[in-house]
């Protein structure tokens, strides 16, 4: 890729992306379920094998068979790592320049304020070699650099391109076009340890729809996944809604897993949130 602008900037970068994906439909009686998995990397020798991707897809599909709804309740919720990155996406949207200068963000005027628990650190690593979101400059030619966005749970900075920065009377953060290798630091627990810590709860493996109010932070999304009782997976779940407010969801994060998903530009482990509403039967 080559970028050149009339203001005198000329830069280039070379990138590659390799991938293997698999989608499977499974059936049991009249019930049918679908799931998928994929591997992605900059270099082909860093990909999982086609066999491993296929086996994981099959196992994920089979565990969904026999899914049912659960009664409406309020329980701890684990967002599986590939799904947990969506929470960070909602956060980034709320601190992005466009939402801020339009005053259409539930995190308006939160700079320097506590947004997450004090163990949470969220940062950019744009110069990480081999990572999926690495870039030495943004889409306006502004140099990127590692920086903390959240430290000790406190919001340290916004996500700005040059136009939104001018509107806010601030400096660009080198984020025209988005964030680069956004990372939430992992804790010590893996997904299995999180599951074992829960007496009754819900592991979200798929989200459906986009019921997000960016102004108020109200959150409501269709979901499917696995029900947890006494620290073990009990049965698959479908046709439920996970609801809350994003401010509360961020503050009520209990743990961030060490099962980091590195297949995209957001690098995130599973996230355990206390006390979300599951709307079911």
Language model segments and positions:
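Dual-mode signal for accessory low-complexity, basic/Gly-rich regions
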Residues: 43, 108-281
